[in-house]
Amino acid sequence: MFSSSVELELFFIFVLVVLNGIFSGSEIAIVSARKVRLEQLAKRGNRKAKLALKLATAPNNFLSAVQIGITLIGILTGAVGGATVALRLAEFLDDIPLLAPYAGPLSISLLVGFITYLSLVVGELVPKRIALSHPEHIACGVAPAMHLVAQLTAPLVYLLGVSTDAVLRLFGITSKEASPITEEEIRVMIEQGAQAGMIDEAEQEMVERVFRLGDRPVKTLMTPRTAIAWLDVESDWEENQQEILDTPYSRFPVGRDSLDECLGFVRVKDILNSQWSGQKINLEEIVQPPLFVAENTRSLHVLEMFRASGTHLALITDEYGGIEGLVTLNDLIEAIVGSIPNDDEIQEPQIIQREDGSYLLDGLLPIDEFKEIFDIETLSNEEEGHYHTLGGFVIESLGKIPQSGDYFVSDTLRVEVVDMDGIRIDKVLVNQLPEDSSTTEEESETDN
């Protein structure tokens, strides 16, 4: 029915569609390939991976070359257009009485529909699906050919680039460099990796904590001054010895009458060495130089200071030079991996979820962890640095040192003080209220 010229024309159209598919698949593969994976392959000596990485790191020229190829293929496909095929198909339809009056338009419509279908399936969808399923492997496979195409079309790409920039300038648009990847984007990628099962939940939590550690001031991790176990050079050795025996620590700050007169810190190891050698214990002789850190120093920076100094303990100072607290290397590690209790330490959890869904929280709970529990973005006066713990948030919200039973409402949370340790907030009960709750902060203050 059809002559050899028709078959040749159909074959030529099919070849053009396949070439279009190669360009489309190559574009998707190189753009979506993970650069980290390509770098790993390139370091192992994979030359194709080096070419793919080169194309991926400078995508503008490569994408322009691909677009030139796809455009030329589209023009050639339209030029060939299957004119001979349409003519032969019209002659075939003329033999059918019912279709004879519409043979010409119908043959063109059928041919256009066939070429469109073939172009979409073979020239676009299938190659892109394949490229997305194995981007790095395919990117390495097509890199040599695409690199050659980019070199051959370089003059035309340059001309098109200059022309495009000129047109954009007419509209007052200037090209900008791609913004670097943000921390939030990394968080999303990690979350997606965890959902896909590629990253363990524990690994995800640790990475999230590392990000938080970079933002948290060291004050949020410190042991407050009132809870510091320290040794006084003016006290009898028996008193200092009992302080060491009563606590599980291996390092102690040393002061003279007060922590504000801090001389440094001593290691229990050095005390034992002096004692076992028969020497009289003199804390001033074995004291190590102290490391002082401002209260608003970022925790991650303190970790770097520990690494540089070889010290595992730092004293936190306020703006007046007074000792406000103490932080150790163990505190920073626990902020990343979670609580690590000592063998002889019975540690009460800071977060307890009760059967009714409410939470019993420690007053010293870092405010970042409180926000994470209830998925809160920001709290009142938090950015001003007025508080860093749940207890500080309660005092800020109530405007006074509370008593047991005092409470307030913040958004949909009812926050109640249930236990005080002197003037320190020990335990706080937090309930999630319904969103349509009519309870207001003003009503709670009236009740109090």
Curated annotation (Swiss-Prot):
GO terms for cellular component: plasma membrane. The keyword 4Fe-4S does not apply. It holds the Pfam family CorC_HlyC. The chain crosses the membrane at residues 11-31, 62-82, 106-126, 142-162. The keyword Transmembrane applies. InterPro entries: CBS_dom, CBS_dom_sf, CNNM, FAD-bd_PCMH-like_sf, FAD-bd_PCMH_sub2, Ion_transp-like_CBS, Transptr-assoc_dom, UPF0053_domain. GO terms for molecular function: flavin adenine dinucleotide binding. SUPFAM superfamilies: CBS-domain pair, FAD-binding/transporter-associated domain-like. It is a multi-pass membrane protein. It comes from the Bacteria. Keywords: CBS domain, Cell membrane, Membrane, Repeat, Transmembrane, Transmembrane helix. Residues 222-281, 286-345 form the CBS domain. Residues 2-203 form the CNNM transmembrane domain. Belongs to the UPF0053 family. PANTHER family: UPF0053 PROTEIN YRKA (PTHR43099:SF2). This is UPF0053 protein sll0260.
